[in-house]
């Protein structure tokens, strides 16, 4: 417990003081800016001094762990630092050692298999050309130097015929590799309100080296004042970094420990969103992430702000599109999925083209296992509304890289990637898993005590029911909610099977009559099966009702019995339809089906266990009923689509067969399934709008339960009739409840595996 509190405290501190990693490359370019009115002196001598103090023993400038191979990034940073020192004629020994390092590793610059900073084939040869103009000599063959210089010529020739906005942005972004080849007005069109070019210190500094500009100098002055003698590779980056923190905390399953901090970050981001802050609006990745996180946390944000990238052609015209930036593609695709209305055509369009580009990238990537491609495949296969929280948490924890970095002109570490967040997530998941195991053991005993395992007609689905509880209502303190959810899930499965397979007409009528009377001393059981089913429901509902009533400060047991009675009456209606061969209209079927799908006894009682007090007028409110209807509609139609063939063989009607029947043969089965899918999409979007809305009688934690169940039915029925497939969910159950975490080892230092 103490260790967990320490980890939380350190993480809070890190949230408050976001630290950006130092960029030697950008610092070197800032060091090259001359003093206004005296081009023989540096404007930022402290940066020059920092370069002198931070050369590595091997002559390089760059951050590398022991035994880690030299990268093109390190070569680029080293050459930039050499140029900065030569520009002011200081550090002759440093320059010599730097040139020797470059000479020893020059082949790496020409190795296309090694990851390169953005624009490397322009910036590195450009710096080589600048170095030779300063009479610097490299201990390498001239043919190798010429080969690299030729690379720049080839790239510039290839780009010459491209007059797109994206190409112009790219050329301006890598201006330090172009010298005077770029016209001043071609650069100026990309200057931001803060004076920078692309929020990039090296681009801004390189521009100042060739053309004086007051606003650009003010930006660099501000930068050096804030960071001292060494600058980051992007600034400002506050919004992106803070949103990345929020995203990471949610993905790792520990956001519940930082509720106030997350709210503060999102409140601030929302203000920036409303003000159309350039830090958000001019960066596609940040804009898409802000939209997704703000919307999913209940803030009102319009998808209109994403209209500049509504079409693939618009994305390709941007700098990120020109660079084929996978991260921005993923974020756009994720953002497109949080649609709350059929009228958000912008999101539909973004989802269509970004999904196509992601699929193309995944296919062309082949069998490579790079993390970014794994993330792309996962995003395509599992939209957020088909995933279970705890399964996602485990996957993200096991794949978390505490040395995670991104590559722009140089590599930089992401502030949220650190051992503390990983250690906290590991501790939380592992301790929660221990609780889940105890709860599952208790439930297994409960099934036997209630003799539910003695019913030959009933599917034994306890582990699935408990999975849906533990994987979504995951915080440790919500044990009573998980138990209620799982018990009622088991009981609804038993009752469903009893009405479908196990019970005669007389038995079903007897069971309903018993629930109507709700008398524990009743002895008028038509059969032993009825006795077991009723006794289990009666005992469980009364026990849960007593606990819920104590929490709510009023008696809610009657409401719980009403829920069960509604379910059984709807199931009896379906049984009568089947017995009499009655074919209902689609409207009749769906009005009954949203109840008979049996989510009511699972979700509605659990609302009483998640915190808020619900007055009786809330559970009678239109919003409450609409949340239930939309959730159940998704579940019923998903189940009908996947179970159509099986149910047809059993002689059962469902929405798909009814659509075909009532069309008079004008639509096919596939067309009926497509129509059902459209209704699913509409219901899911409308449900999300209600869940995220600030207005209404139902408290947000309670609304979230309806959404959690919607995700569960999407996960269970999105590809197969999962609840009827014995092997489909086994690995998911084991992952959440039984199997311990298997952490990756990203480096030989700081691993927390030994402590797990």
Swiss-Prot record:
Motif range (DDXXD motif): 496-500
One GO molecular-function entry: terpene synthase activity
Taxonomy, superkingdom: Eukaryota
Residues annotated to bind Mg(2+) 1: 496, 500
Residue sites binding Mg(2+) 3 per the record: 639, 647
List of residues binding Mg(2+) 2: 496, 500
Matches recorded under InterPro entries: Isoprenoid_synthase_dom_sf (IPR008949), Terpene_cyclase_plant_C1 (IPR044814), Terpene_synth_N (IPR001906), Terpene_synth_N_sf (IPR036965), Terpene_synthase-like (IPR050148), Terpene_synthase_metal-bd (IPR005630), Terpenoid_cyclase/PrenylTrfase (IPR008930)
Cell compartments where the protein resides: Plastid, Chloroplast
Pathway the protein takes part in: Plant hormone biosynthesis; gibberellin biosynthesis
Purpose: Catalyzes the conversion of ent-copalyl diphosphate to the gibberellin precursor ent-kaur-16-ene.
More about this protein: Plants lacking KS1 display a dwarf phenotype with normal root development, but severe stunting of shoots in seedlings, dark green leaves and failure to initiate flowering. This phenotype can be rescued by treatment with exogenous gibberellin.
Record protein name field: Ent-kaur-16-ene synthase, chloroplastic
Native source species: Oryza sativa subsp. japonica (Rice)
């Amino acid at each position: 417990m103490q260790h967990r509190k320490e980890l939380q405290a350190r993480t809070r501190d890190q949230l408050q003081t976001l630290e950006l990693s130092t960029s030697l490359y950008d610092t070197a370019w800032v060091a090259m800016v001359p003093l206004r009115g005296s081009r023989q002196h540096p404007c930022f001598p402290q940066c020059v001094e920092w370069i002198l103090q931070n050369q590595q023993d091997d002559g390089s400038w760059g951050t590398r762990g022991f035994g880690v191979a030299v990268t093109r990034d390190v070569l680029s940073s080293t050459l930039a630092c050499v140029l900065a020192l030569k520009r002011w004629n200081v550090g002759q020994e440093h320059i010599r050692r730097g040139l020797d390092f470059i000479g020893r590793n020059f082949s790496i610059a020409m190795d296309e298999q090694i990851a390169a900073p953005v624009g490397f084939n322009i910036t590195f040869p450009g710096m080589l050309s600048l170095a030779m103009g300063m009479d610097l000599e490299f201990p390498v063959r001239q043919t190798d130097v010429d080969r690299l210089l030729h690379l720049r010529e080839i790239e510039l020739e290839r780009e010459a015929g491209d007059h797109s906005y994206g190409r112009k942005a790219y050329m301006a972004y890598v201006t330090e590799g172009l010298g005077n080849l770029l016209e001043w007005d071609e650069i100026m069109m990309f200057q931001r309100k803060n004076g920078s070019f692309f929020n990039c210190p090296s681009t801004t500094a390189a521009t100042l080296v060739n053309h004086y500009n007051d606003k650009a100098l003010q930006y660099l002055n501000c930068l050096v004042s804030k960071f001292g003698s060494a600058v980051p590779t992007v600034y400002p980056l506050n919004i992106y970094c803070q949103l990345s923190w929020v995203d990471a905390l949610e993905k790792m399953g520990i956001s519940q420990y930082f509720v106030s901090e997350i709210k503060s970050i999102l409140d601030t981001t929302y203000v920036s969103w409303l003000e159309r802050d350039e830090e958000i609006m001019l960066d596609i990745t940040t804009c898409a992430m802000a939209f997704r996180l703000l919307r999913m946390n209940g803030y009102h944000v319009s998808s209109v702000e994403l209209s500049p990238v509504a079409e693939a052609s618009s994305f390709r015209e941007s700098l990120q599109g020109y660079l084929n930036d996978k991260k921005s593609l993923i974020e756009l695709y994720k953002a497109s999925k949080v649609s709350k209305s059929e009228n958000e055509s912008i999101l539909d369009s973004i989802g269509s083209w970004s999904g196509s580009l992601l699929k193309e990238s995944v296919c062309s990537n082949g069998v490579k296992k790079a993390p970014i491609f794994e993330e792309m495949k996962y995003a395509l296969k599992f939209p957020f509304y088909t995933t279970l929280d705890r399964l996602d948490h485990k996957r993200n924890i096991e794949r978390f890289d505490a040395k995670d970095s991104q590559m722009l002109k140089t590599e930089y570490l992401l502030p949220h990637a650190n051992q503390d967040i990983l250690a906290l997530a590991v501790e939380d998941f592992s301790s929660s898993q221990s609780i889940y195991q105890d709860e599952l053991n208790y439930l297994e005993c409960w099934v036997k005590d209630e003799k539910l395992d003695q019913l030959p007609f009933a599917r034994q689905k306890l582990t699935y029911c408990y999975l849906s509880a533990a994987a979504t209502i995951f915080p440790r303190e919500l044990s009573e909610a998980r138990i209620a959810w799982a018990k009622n899930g088991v009981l609804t499965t038993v009752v469903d099977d009893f009405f479908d397979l196990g019970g005669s007409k007389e038995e079903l009528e007897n069971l309903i009559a018993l629930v109507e009377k709700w008398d524990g001393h009743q002895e008028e059981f038509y059969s032993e099966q009825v006795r077991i089913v009723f006794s289990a429901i009666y005992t469980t509902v009364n026990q849960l009702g007593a606990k819920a009533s104590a929490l709510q400060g009023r008696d809610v047991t009657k409401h719980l019995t009403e829920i069960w009675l509604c379910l059984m009456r709807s199931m009896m209606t379906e049984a009568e339809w089947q017995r009499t061969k009655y074919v209902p209209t689609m409207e009749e079927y769906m009005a009954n089906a949203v109840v008979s799908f049996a989510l009511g006894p699972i979700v509605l009682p659990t609302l009483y266990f998640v915190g808020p007090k619900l007055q009786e007028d809330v559970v009678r409110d239109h919003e409450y009923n609409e949340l239930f209807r939309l959730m159940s509609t998704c579940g019923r139609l998903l189940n009908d689509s996947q179970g159509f063939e099986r149910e047809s063989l059993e002689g059962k009607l469902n929405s798909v067969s009814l659509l075909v029947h009532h069309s008079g043969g004008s639509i096919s089965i596939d067309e009926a399934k497509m129509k059902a899918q459209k209704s699913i999409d509409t219901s899911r979007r409308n449900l999300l709008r209600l869940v995220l809305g600030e207005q209404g009688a139902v408290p947000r934690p309670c609304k979230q339960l309806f959404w959690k169940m919607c995700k569960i039915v999407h996960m269970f029925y999105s590809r197969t009739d999962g609840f009827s497939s014995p092997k489909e969910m086994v690995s998911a159950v084991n992952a959440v409840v039984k199997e311990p975490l298997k952490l990756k080892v990203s480096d030989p230092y700081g691993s927390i595996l030994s402590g797990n």
